[in-house]
């Protein structure tokens, strides 16, 4: 299965810009078919890539980039996440960000702000592995199904479909640790560490304790990830087209990473807004026993599900920007192929009468 996916990825339309880098315009046009792959290998050699686009090594390193980008960033903002969760589950006590920090410091001390760091690190590292690794796989797979012209015309829909598919599996890996994290952060005296929380949760509710929140996590994370990837991809495309004063190929690696960070932050703001209501439901659901998502949603009401939005915008905006920056930096460090924003295929230009 994986070998067939790798084969499809090597020939997918997103890879076309790299093939054009080594095209000799003075010579005769190469025939279609097998030579395409050899041209790509030549491009990889010219660029000094460590692996071939679409190879198993490529996907593995993309997954590793996801581990670092999600695991490290989510762990770094645990204090803000803790206060946000407490505002969602007990708005009468925690009335705002600064008030929440003040009460937490007074009751739990500085160490209390780090509650839930272990399940956060483990859970989001596993999620990042699946999210970024599978996104690259599904993007290549779906683009091959659509073909070169349709991939360009429907690229936003492709980004949405690939990211939703990847996040579906990523959340199955995340859900158990997310449930433990919320228990540790929002139920005083329940458990102080992951080692205390997991056995206690299993004893009380069995496996259901770890996966009862997976549907709300899907509700929160799938729209979030769809927005995160699609908005990022199109923002990068727009920045290079309308803002950056020179082509991407002429930008240094550092300049490209700055564009990545800016596009990531813009995407993060939209992500926070789209996913916040479901995030509020998840926080309350994992705190309470026996409640369902619909019951929690009905009880919170419209205003209740938007509690803590400002904190989430700050957190998710910064988080998303850093995640894309780290992920792209990993690609640069390991010398992975980094295709530029997609360009309209020549065949489509001819159909639309855009060629001379």
From Swiss-Prot:
Keywords: Acetylation, Membrane, Methylation, Mitochondrion, Mitochondrion inner membrane, Phosphoprotein, Repeat, Symport, Transit peptide, Transmembrane, Transmembrane helix, Transport. One of its GO terms (biological process) is phosphate ion transmembrane transport. The keyword Mitochondrion applies. Residues 81-115, 178-212, 279-308 are mitochondrial matrix. It catalyses: phosphate(in) + H(+)(in) = phosphate(out) + H(+)(out). PANTHER family: SOLUTE CARRIER FAMILY 25 (MITOCHONDRIAL CARRIER PHOSPHATE CARRIER), MEMBER 3, LIKE-RELATED-RELATED (PTHR45671), SOLUTE CARRIER FAMILY 25 MEMBER 3 (PTHR45671:SF10). This is Solute carrier family 25 member 3. It comes from Rattus norvegicus (Rat).
């Amino acid at each position: 299965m994986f070998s067939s996916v790798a084969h499809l990825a090597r020939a997918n339309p997103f890879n076309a810009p790299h093939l054009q880098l080594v095209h000799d315009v003075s010579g005769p046009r190469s025939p279609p078919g097998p030579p395409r792959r050899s041209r790509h290998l030549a491009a990889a050699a010219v660029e000094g890539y460590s692996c071939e686009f679409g190879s198993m090594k490529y996907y593995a390193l993309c997954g590793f980039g996801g581990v670092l980008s999600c695991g490290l960033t989510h762990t770094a903002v645990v204090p803000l996440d803790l206060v946000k969760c407490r505002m969602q589950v007990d708005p009468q006590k925690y009335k705002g960000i600064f008030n929440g920090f003040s009460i937490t410091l007074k009751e739990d001390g500085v160490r209390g702000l780090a509650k839930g760091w272990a399940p956060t690190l483990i859970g989001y590292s596993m999620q990042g592995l699946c999210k970024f690794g599978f996104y690259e796989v599904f993007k290549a797979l779906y683009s091959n199904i659509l073909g070169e012209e349709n991939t360009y015309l429907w690229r936003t829909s492709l980004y949405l479909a690939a990211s939703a598919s990847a996040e579906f599996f990523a959340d199955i890996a995340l859900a158990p640790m997310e449930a433990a994290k919320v228990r540790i952060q929002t139920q005083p005296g329940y458990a102080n560490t992951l080692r205390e929380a997991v056995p206690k949760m299993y004893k009380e509710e069995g496996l259901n304790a770890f996966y009862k929140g997976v549907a709300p996590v899907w509700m929160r994370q799938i729209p979030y990830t769809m927005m995160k990837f699609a908005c990022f991809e199109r923002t990068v495309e727009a920045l290079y087209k309308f803002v950056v004063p020179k082509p991407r190929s002429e930008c240094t690696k550092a300049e490209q990473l700055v564009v990545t960070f800016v596009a990531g932050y813009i995407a993060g703001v939209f992500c926070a807004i789209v996913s916040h209501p479901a995030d509020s439901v998840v926080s309350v659901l994992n705190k309470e026993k026996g409640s369902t998502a619909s019951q929690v949603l009905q009880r919170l009401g419209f205003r209740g599900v938007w509690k803590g939005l400002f904190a989430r915008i700050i957190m998710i905006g910064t988080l998303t920007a850093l995640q894309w920056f780290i992920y792209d930096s990993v690609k640069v460090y390991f010398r992975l192929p980094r295709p530029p924003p997609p360009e309209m295929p020549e065949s489509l230009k001819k159909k639309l009468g855009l060629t001379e």
